[in-house]
UniProtKB/Swiss-Prot annotation:
GO terms for cellular component: cytosol; nucleus. Keywords: Coiled coil. Belongs to the HSBP1 family. The gene is HSBP1L1. It comes from Homo sapiens (Human). This is Heat shock factor-binding protein 1-like protein 1. One of its GO terms (biological process) is cellular heat acclimation.
């Protein structure tokens, strides 16, 4: 026996609509999360590439050793 009593008119339709909305929101949230994770990974890779390029430029300019020496002095 169902202790909740009789269902209100339109209650099932409202519940179904709410469940559908929740499912849709969950799918959008998962897609957004995946997109953000991908973009963060891409940004991390770009930062690593930038750091490598800056280091290479410093070596080419001959200033890498002088910066290391200054850091050791302080």
């Amino acid at each position: 026996m169902d202790v909740r009593g009789p269902e209100a008119p339109g209650g099932r339709a409202l519940r179904d609509a709410a469940e559908n909305l929740f499912q849709e929101l969950q799918e959008h949230f998962q897609a957004l999360t995946a997109t953000l994770n991908l973009r963060m990974e891409e940004m991390g890779n770009r930062i690593e590439d930038l750091q490598k390029n800056v280091k290479d430029l410093m070596v080419q300019a001959g200033i890498e050793n002088s910066i290391k020496e200054q850091m050791l002095k302080t």
